[in-house]
Amino acid sequence: MAEIKYKVKKEEEGLRLDQLLSKMNEVPSRSSAQRWVKDKHVQINKTIVESPSRKLKWGDILEVMIPPPKSLDLRPEKGNLEILYEDNDLIVFVKPAGLVVHPSAGHEAGTLVNILLEHCHDLSGIGGATRPGIVHRLDKDTSGIMVSAKNDKTHQHLAKQFKDHSVRRSYQALVWGILKNKKGSINAPLGRHPVNRKQIAVVPNGRRAVTHWEVEHCYSNTSLLTCRLETGRTHQIRVHLSSQGFPIVGDPLYGKSSHHLLKFMNEPAKSALKNFKRQALHACDLGFFHPGREEEMDFSHPAPKDYKNLLEMMELEDSVKNGHGSPKDLER
């Protein structure tokens, strides 16, 4: 079992234990750090600690026993994945909307991980027993490009890139409303909602979160944006845009407040928006450094059919409103 020894620096005094651990290259993520602490793999000054929130002092000596990858007890399942690239180290693919990334309570099977295990037969186990190969996630109802690691070395390299925010990620988002500016940035810390624990919110002492956005097209009552992530927090784009008054169309958690705009639209367009049962968010671009090939790689993929159909309906609605078509065009 590999070991990390580390002496807390003066400028690191007051940090949470899991916060400092997650900055180390050997630790895949903050959730991994928390799991290692709770599993009694971490000592401070020769004493085992079990609280990830333990505040550190200048001069504390940390000793971390890196646990070996857990054996995988998951059932491979057949499924259709559009693969953009694959080699012995990693696989790049398109996750469809509606697919949960990894098993959890209530989703023990039928996940992306189960499908990857069937296709790849072997994945990096460093992310934990239920998250083999997973170095980043997309929400269940968000579609788009993902990368998974096939071995531990690649997993560590990719995880560090995500941690250092050097991975290039862009998303296409259809939002309610017309933005006044053509582009901008949202720098607002995120954390758990103080009341609804299923939601994320902008909170004063949350984790740093930065989203850059640019308007691609404005329709009658909606706008199509390209959003680039500088950080990658849970629900980041969804919460940031909603906090600015432009929630994503179809978002069940953060987008309900803008349905009043439907009354200004023709019935077919109104119906299309009402019946779009997921957030209109698609991970369209992904770029990273391939550790095995030692080169930068970039991938792009257009939005899926349901998203394209919605955008076509918005274009027709726009055309009718501008006098370039008739309401009957929307019914075709």
Identify the meaning behind each predicted range:
Residues 2-332:
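RNA pseudouridine synthases
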